[in-house]
Amino acid sequence: MANVTLYKQDGSENGKVELNDAIWAVEPNENVVFDAVVMQRASLRQGTHAVKNRSAVSGGGRKPWRQKGTGRARQGSIRSPQWRGGGIVFGPTPRSYAYKLPKKVRRLAIKSVLSQKVLDSDLVVVDGLNFDAPKTKAFATVLDGLKVSDKALVVLEDGNEVAAKAARNLPNVKVVPAEGINVLDVVDYKKLILTQSALQKIEEVLA
């Protein structure tokens, strides 16, 4: 099994931690990762676009002129699509863009991006992130000790609200629970910082 350095909160080394090869040593599949990112971004779309068709636009209930005898083209409503201010034909309607990839594909995608972090030496495992109070400065000090200056995704165990609040004002840091780790976030952030408890939770879910 592969292993990475385990760090203390102050940035000093605290031995090694073993990684499950079935999760962290998978050959990255770029096509699957791309599909997963597109799926997640599609689900983020609001899909609230809408226009008025001729049944929704106001007015136009009366025939503008008689059918015959005027010399003009016959018209039934001033809200027909060919009129200025008329209804739109086949316009966009509210819809959901969300869809799901097969479960095996989604799992391969998350394993691929996690394995890529190991290959790129962008995985940082900390034995714990414990703070007396949710202070942004305290969390920034931890990042300095870990020598993390890039965008960082911090994955915490459940219930660590103090650490989550301490990090939320840092501009290049995002905090997610272990159950909420996803392909899009891992791809978007350069460094992946895990607590040891979060690492165990991820391996329980994905193993």
Curated annotation (Swiss-Prot):
Name the keywords, alphabetized.
Ribonucleoprotein, Ribosomal protein, RNA-binding, rRNA-binding
| InterPro entries per the UniProt record, alphabetical | Ribosomal_uL4 (IPR002136), Ribosomal_uL4-like (IPR013005), Ribosomal_uL4_dom_sf (IPR023574)
Q: Name one GO cellular component term.
A: ribonucleoprotein complex
Annotated spans, Disordered = 49-86
Entry-linked SUPFAM superfamilies: Ribosomal protein L4 (SSF52166)
Quaternary structure and interacting proteins, as annotated: Part of the 50S ribosomal subunit.
What name goes with this protein? Large ribosomal subunit protein uL4
In its UniProt entry, the species of origin is given as Lacticaseibacillus casei (strain BL23) (Lactobacillus casei)
Q: What is the lineage of its organism?
A: Bacteria, Bacillati, Bacillota, Bacilli, Lactobacillales
Q: Which gene encodes it?
A: rplD
